[in-house]
Amino acid sequence: MKYLFINSSKDKAGINIRNNLEKLNNINNNCIIDFFETPKKLTELSKKDLPQDYDYYIFLSKHRSVSEKPTLTVHTSGNLTTDNSHGGNIEEVCCCDAILNTILLVNINKYNNLEKYKKLGFDVSFEAIHHAPTDLDVPSVFVEIGSSEKEWAIDEAGEIMANAIIDTISSIESKSYKKLDKVIAFGGGHYAPRFTKLSLSNKCFVGYIIPKYAKISEKVLQQLIQMQDFDYILFDWKGINSEDKKRYIEFFDKNNILWKKVKDLCY
């Protein structure tokens, strides 16, 4: 497999992660790993800006939030609605690999819980789909250090992310991971606490996450089921508006797509 690590020269967190990746000498020799740095913001990129012929794009990025809570996050990019204020095309999502996203999250959490890193006080979570790029047709994922300029420059945070990325690639290349169902997740807030918990408990592989606040069209629903390999749809049942839930279920039933509730996995 061929992996491209992408960072912006304007992004301190991305540079931090890249510098730590370049220090590692335990990279799997059976795969090809390349680096690509752009002067653009990552949210300004599209397919035409990136080298082609890669199997995976891994974006090394900062995360910003109003709370400035120290957080390490994972998500696939895209615009679920007609709001493209953070770049990309409206109602368009990048290709997603639930196995890649979830193993990344699990490995980030593993390193974050080591004694040498616990003092940093980072949370670990998924994020819902958001921002550009939106037009990438190979699996793409953002790994982000947040949520303020202080955290972006913490070298140990870059170490956590770099080690997690390399461990993830090693697992994918060797297929040395537990086989779990792959899901597309609907409901809950932006940081998807229930889906984060399920993934960290090894209940399933979570790919796309569609939050409660995104009322997505049938056009986007079609993209989701075409752009990610999945076994079924997973609903955070109380984390979705009833009207949206009804509309989504009608679409999935019409297309003979299996769906389940989060509580079905909480055994």
UniProtKB/Swiss-Prot annotation:
Keywords: Hydrolase, Metal-binding, Zinc. It is an enzyme of class 3 (hydrolase). GO terms for molecular function: D-aminoacyl-tRNA deacylase activity; zinc ion binding. InterPro entries: Deacylase_DtdA_archaea, DtdA. Its cofactor is Zn(2+). Its EC number is 3.1.1.96. It holds the Pfam family tRNA_deacylase. The keyword Transcription regulation does not apply. Monomer. NCBIfam families: PRK03995.1-3. PANTHER family: D-AMINOACYL-TRNA DEACYLASE. Belongs to the DtdA deacylase family. This is D-aminoacyl-tRNA deacylase.
